[in-house]
Amino acid sequence: MLNIQRFVCNMIRENCYVISDSSKECVIIDCGAYYEEERRAIVDYIAKETLKPVHLLATHGHLDHNFGNNTIFEEFSLKPEVGYGDREFMKNLKGQAKDTFGVEVDYDFPPVGHFFEDEEVITFGTHELKVISTPGHTPGGVTFYCEDENVAFTGDTLFKGSIGRTDLGGSMFMIINSLRELAQLPDDTTVLSGHGESTTIGDELAHNPYMDR
């Protein structure tokens, strides 16, 4: 069984997920923790549950999904893993802070530790996450899909009732193709996105104007 803990982070309410299983190994997805209390909440949860973080994953390279990477690196020696197409975003996280979010950061971000290949499999504990290339919101956006638990972490590609914007280095053509890829998942797949509440592939096919097969 997969345990999923959501943390809503930073000034635009980004969803960070800590997922674990009975092995106590865990994966941190999209650590957007900006404020100190958000960072401590994630670290304290990991300590309380006696978890062992083994991967720091990012669905894409926008700063709101990576604010807290330095804390995870300092606490657990994990570097972020991200799609290769977002390498330039990851090199310029400090620039994003000032230009996009209007804030200054007085710390350095850890370098990327690994760039994903499409359909790469990430293992932790007794579970696997399949990397699905879903560009469009950004050039290197990915979705993490756990087939055993039928859950997809879609970042900012797919939201409940909507999709991610494409004017920050993305492409509408690419995101529509990515949505068609996600539409091939089972209808009862739980979708956990980068912002907002959960949904399912079936609900999005029924109600999201951007989704079809």
Roles of regions detected by a PLM:
Residues 34-123, 206-210:
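Active-site HxH/HxHxD metal-binding segment of metal-dependent hydrolases
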Residues 27, 57, 80, 152-153, ...:
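Residue-level marker for buried hydrophobic side chains located in beta-strands
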